[in-house]
Amino acid sequence: MNNTAWWIIIFILILLILAAGEIYRETHTFRVRKYKVKTKKNIGIQNCVKVIFLSDLHNCVYGNKNDKLYKAIQAEMPDMILIGGDMLVAKEGSSVQEALEFVKKLPHICQVYYTNGNHEQRMKENTDIYGDTYERYKAKLENCGVCFLENKAENIEKNGMKFSIYGLELDSSVNRKFKKADVTEKTVEEKIGKKGKDYSILMAHNPAYMDAYKKWGADLILSGHLHGGLVRCPGIGAVVTPQGFLFP
């Protein structure tokens, strides 16, 4: 083997090591991103309302019992925490304990609203596989003060601001790989009813149906599911989604 071939092999090995390091970093660290959302609607704002949005932890733990993440949320002093689903992993033999122990602490900070992702929904619907694991998980969190929004809405008045939070749970078929379901404004309305007059925050786990959410009339849409893309490239961003769609 000549020197050129050896250098090519070394270069490929370095790339693989760097890629492995980046994957480890992305799955073992988190970053707090801040957004300021403004509206032209007259909704009686006297002060701002600070919201923490969490989604798709998939049993991931940052520090001892998720201490690092909990303290980071606590330091932000939010008015409420919204959870967009997939905090656990629906897989035979997988425990919900990590998600349960973390989420049950959050009401000590502020009110928590939880909308299911495809993993919670899979666990809820497939009782032949998971038994009553989901119902027990939900009941324990509700006992700690977590409010589940499963195709439900909650009317909120906070800091002089009136708004509604909707939790949308579409049929499991919307999450099939390599195929988009036919989700329309009417589909959303059938699940959660017509949008009210107040400013509306819609939590809908899968963003693939964003057009339907917009046409329904949501003022602010919060989704997860994409994980920033299963495959990402520098300068391009997400290339492949968990459902197998390109360039989300």
List each model region and its residues.
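N-terminal membrane-anchoring alpha-helices
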Residues: M1-I45
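Beta-strand-turn-beta hairpins that frame and shape the catalytic cleft
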Residues: K38-I52, V146, A153-I165, K195-K197
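Membrane-embedded segments
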Residues: I45-C147
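Active-site metal-binding loops of divalent metal-dependent hydrolases
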Residues: L54-N59, G85-M87, N118-E120, K152-A153, ...
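Short, flexible loop segments at the rims of nucleotide/cofactor-binding pockets, characterized by
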Residues: L57-Y62, V89-G93, K177-K180, Y199-S200, ...
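Short, Asp-centered acidic motifs that coordinate Mg2+ and/or phosphate
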Residues: D79-M80, Y113, V146-C147, F163, ...
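Binuclear metal-dependent hydrolase catalytic cores centered on His/Asp/Glu-rich metal-binding motifs
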Residues: K124-G145, K158-S200, M210-D211, W216
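Conserved beta-sheet core of the metallophosphoesterase superfamily
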Residues: N143, I201, N206-P248
